[in-house]
C-alpha cells in the first residue's frame, strides 16, 4: 500500500495539474485566451483511456474554468453525450484536426501508451504527426504523463526521438518510460516523471457501486474476485490456463468470479471465451459503464487479477489487493512502483 506522503507527493490533483499550468502560462494569448487541444486514444470504448481523458479534463477545469478545451475523439457524439464535453471533433477528419491545431495555444498529447509500435506503426505515426504539425504551427506541446514503448523498429525509434525532442514539456508516468526516451537519445534533464492521471480520479459512491453490481445479476452471498483479461496472441492454451486459474481461485477461496470488461467489445469476447472453459459459474460486468462506475465496483471486490493497467490502478485507488499479469512492460513498470 502506498504511504500517504507518497500519494500527496505524486498523485494529488495539484501535483498532476502543476505541469499543465506551467505550459498554459507559456501558451497564454491575450487575443484568443487559453485554448487546449487534447489528443489521445479517446472514443474507443477503452475505460482506461476514457479515465485518462476525463481526469485530465476535470483537473484542468479545476485549475482554471476559463480554459477552452477541445478533444479529438474517434466518436465525438458518444464522447459528448457520455461526458458532457462541449467541443469534441473527429480525430479522423484531417482538415478539422488541422484547423483545431491552428486554433489552439497548446496541444496536450496523452496520457496513456500512445508512443509505441506494438499496436501498429500507423497508430504511432498518427500521434507523432499531431505533435509535429502543432510544432510546425508554432504551438506549445506537452506530453502529459505518457507511457513510452515498446518501440521496437529502428526507424520508429528515430522518429520518436526527432518528434518528441520538439515538445516543450515532457512528463512521463513511470521511470521506465524516462529510461526508454533516454535510450533513444533524449536528455534526461528534459524528462519529468509524474504518474498516471487516473490516480486523481474519484469513484462513484459505495451505494451506487453496490446497486450496479446488483443490477448486473451478481449475487451477494460470497465475496467477489475481479478478473480483467484481454486478447493475447490468439492463444487458446492461454485461455484454458486462465480458466483453470479462475476455477482454482473459486474453489479454494469460495468467492464469486466476476469478469470486468475494460475495452468493449474486445475484452467481452475474450472474457466469454474464458468463462466458457470454466467449470464453475462466473459473472461479467459488460455494460457501457463509466470509468468512475467501474472503479466503484472494483472497490467492492476482495481481489483483482488483471492484464489491464488501469484495472490495477483502479484497484490500487480503492485499496483492493492486486495480481498483475505482465503481458506488456507497462504492467511491470507499474508493479515495480508498488
Give, region by region, the residue ranges found by the protein language model:
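A short, well-ordered alpha-helix in the C-terminal region of glycosyltransferases
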Residues: 1-10, 18-22
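Active-site anion-handling motifs in enzyme catalytic cores
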Residues: 12, 29-338
Amino acid at each position: 500500500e502506498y504511504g500517504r506522503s507518497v500519494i500527496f507527493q505524486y498523485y494529488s490533483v495539484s501535483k498532476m495539474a502543476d505541469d499543465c499550468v506551467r505550459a498554459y502560462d507559456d501558451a497564454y494569448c491575450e487575443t484568443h485566451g487559453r485554448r487546449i487541444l487534447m489528443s489521445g486514444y479517446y472514443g474507443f470504448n477503452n475505460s482506461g483511456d476514457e479515465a485518462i481523458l476525463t481526469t485530465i479534463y476535470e483537473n484542468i477545469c479545476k485549475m482554471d474554468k476559463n480554459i477552452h478545451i477541445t478533444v479529438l475523439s474517434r466518436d465525438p457524439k458518444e464522447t459528448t453525450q457520455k461526458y458532457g464535453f462541449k467541443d469534441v471533433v473527429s480525430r479522423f477528419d484531417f482538415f478539422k484536426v488541422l484547423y483545431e491545431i491552428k486554433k489552439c495555444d497548446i496541444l496536450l498529447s496523452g496520457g496513456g501508451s500512445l508512443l509505441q509500435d506494438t499496436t501498429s506503426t500507423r497508430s504511432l505515426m498518427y500521434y507523432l504527426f499531431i505533435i509535429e504539425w502543432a510544432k510546425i504551427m508554432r504551438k506549445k506541446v506537452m506530453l502529459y504523463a505518457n507511457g513510452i514503448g515498446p518501440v521496437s523498429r529502428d526507424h520508429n525509434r528515430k522518429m520518436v526521438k526527432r518528434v518528441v525532442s520538439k515538445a516543450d514539456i515532457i512528463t512521463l508516468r513511470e521511470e521506465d518510460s524516462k529510461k526508454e526516451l533516454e535510450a533513444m537519445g533524449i536528455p534526461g534533464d528534459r524528462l519529468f516523471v509524474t504518474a498516471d492521471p487516473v490516480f486523481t480520479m474519484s469513484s462513484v459512491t459505495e451505494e451506487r457501486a453496490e446497486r450496479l453490481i446488483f443490477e448486473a445479476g451478481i449475487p451477494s452471498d460470497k465475496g467477489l474476485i475481479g478478473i480483467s483479461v484481454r486478447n493475447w496472441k490468439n492463444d487458446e492454451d492461454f485461455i484454458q490456463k486462465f480458466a483453470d486459474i479462475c476455477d482454482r481461485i473459486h474453489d479454494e477461496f469460495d468467492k464469486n468470479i466476476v469478469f470486468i470488461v475494460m475495452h468493449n467489445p474486445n475484452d467481452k469476447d475474450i472474457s466469454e471465451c474464458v468463462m466458457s472453459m470454466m467449470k464453475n459459474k462466473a459473472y461479467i460486468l459488460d455494460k457501457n459503464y463509466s470509468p468512475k462506475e467501474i472503479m466503484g465496483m472494483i472497490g467492492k471486490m476482495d481481489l483483482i487479477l488483471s492484464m489491464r493497467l488501469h484495472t490495477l490502478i483502479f484497484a490500487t485507488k480503492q485499496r483492493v489487493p492486486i495480481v498483475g499479469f505482465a503481458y506488456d512492460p507497462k504492467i511491470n513498470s507499474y508493479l515495480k512502483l508498488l
